Amino acid sequence: MIDFRPFYQQIATTNLSDWLETLPLQLKEWETQTHGDYAKWSKIVDFLSDLHADEIDLKSAVKSDRTSPLSEGEKQRIIHHLKQLMPWRKGPYHLFGIHVDCEWRSDFKWDRVLPHLSPLQGRTILDVGCGSGYHMWRMVGEGAKMVVGIDPTELFLCQFEAVRKLLNNDRRANLIPLGIEQMQPLAAFDTVFSMGVLYHRKSPLDHLSQLKNQLVKGGELVLETLVVDGDVNTVLIPADRYAKMKNVYFIPSVAALINWLEKVGFTNVRCVDVATTTLEEQRKTDWLENESLIDFLDPNDHSKTIEGYQAPKRAVILANK
């Protein structure tokens, strides 16, 4: 089972220390309600060899390697363990010569977001809905002091811990298996990321307020989410599914999204990037047995989802508390 005590020790003397009033009890309760496969997944993490990497690159990729290559047997054992943690959705990872080719080329998103950010050097960062943590490692690569990701999905936690083990057990990033609605308002993070989360929320303004509550005064929000074309009054509310996803509730235009952010009290709100999701960025691989973007689009018109809505387009919005 994953041991969170090192994280408690890490934050005990930081601005996050108030979290210790609630977090240990929440995680004890979480352990009693975990997914039926969690014990199996966490054992897979334990089975991974403690390999020492001579080279780690988190600046241009998430990559570890050593001067003497793994034997083919060692490499196949690691691949076997990592494939037991499928599906791998966000990546890619390059670990001791093994290319974990995930469904999403999350490096594409990072390349769109990074040029617009306030420097991450020395910052304490919260990544909401962090998945298996790919972007967290890239934040560490930009010099972040501490990155905390929150995501309630147990598989993502085990994937994150598996990658951590193959990155010399780097403790600068930590994944906590909770949702933001379970976090007390800490007002302690210099930067808060919420990427690919807002459209899954039944109450998007509540989500934006929760993000604001975690930021220090003047801190930076990085919001990345689905948008549709239209004016300040345009919001798509899918009748049933959107791109085969059941849990999509509100997809605003950029103008409407900026209005929402200003309404909950953010300042200096600006859109810095808009990009249509491509079949190069989201696709099937050997590390994902499920459907992917090609299956979610109208086969005769890729500008539409299979339900007839505008195809996925994503905006990056920055704002300050």
Curated annotation (Swiss-Prot):
Keywords, sorted A to Z: Transferase, tRNA processing
Annotated positions binding carboxy-S-adenosyl-L-methionine: 90, 104, 109, 129, 151-153, 180-181, 195, 199, 314
Keyword Transferase set for record: yes
EC number: 2.5.1.-
SUPFAM superfamilies from the UniProt entry: S-adenosyl-L-methionine-dependent methyltransferases
Any one GO molecular function term: methyltransferase activity
Disulfide bonds: none
Catalytic activity, as annotated: carboxy-S-adenosyl-L-methionine + 5-hydroxyuridine(34) in tRNA = 5-carboxymethoxyuridine(34) in tRNA + S-adenosyl-L-homocysteine + H(+)
Enzyme class: transferase
GO biological process, one term: tRNA wobble uridine modification
Domain of life: Bacteria
HAMAP family reported for this sequence: tRNA_carboxymethyltr_CmoB (MF_01590)
Protein's job: Catalyzes carboxymethyl transfer from carboxy-S-adenosyl-L-methionine (Cx-SAM) to 5-hydroxyuridine (ho5U) to form 5-carboxymethoxyuridine (cmo5U) at position 34 in tRNAs.
Matching NCBIfam families: PRK15068.1, tRNA 5-methoxyuridine(34)/uridine 5-oxyacetic acid(34) synthase CmoB
Family per similarity comment: Belongs to the class I-like SAM-binding methyltransferase superfamily. CmoB family.
Summary of subunit composition and partner proteins: Homotetramer.
Protein name: tRNA U34 carboxymethyltransferase
